[in-house]
């Protein structure tokens, strides 16, 4: 089982959302299009710009991603996350 932590602001600031399962629509958690930094504690995750695991995606392995450029994405774009 993996774990990913999404943050509202760059450098791991603001509200955070900890997940251990895939989420097809981050709006359910109030986190649609607001993610600006990520910590992957374990597992491999794909983050997607659109709901339903669609649109541009980025593969993330354990580590810290302090801003969208660190995973190759854009600020405030993520809408779904999927654990591999």
From Swiss-Prot:
Domain of life: Eukaryota
Gene: Ci-bg-crystallin
UniProt remark on domains: Has a single-domain beta-structure, folded into two very similar Greek key motifs.
Tissues in which the protein is found: Palps of larvae and otolith of the light-sensing ocellus.
Residue segments, region Disordered: 64-84
Signal peptide: none
UniProt keyword annotation of Repeat present: yes
PROSITE patterns according to UniProt: CRYSTALLIN_BETA_GAMMA (PS50915)
Annotated Beta/gamma crystallin 'Greek key' domain residues: 2-42, 43-84
Pfam family, one: Crystall
Keyword Repeat applies: yes
Subunit annotation: Monomer.
Keywords: Repeat
Name used for this protein in its record: Beta/gamma-crystallin
Family to which this protein belongs: Belongs to the beta/gamma-crystallin family.
InterPro entries attached to this UniProt entry: Beta/Gamma-Crystallin (IPR050252), Beta/gamma_crystallin (IPR001064), G_crystallin-like (IPR011024)
Role: Structural component of the neuroectodermal visual system.
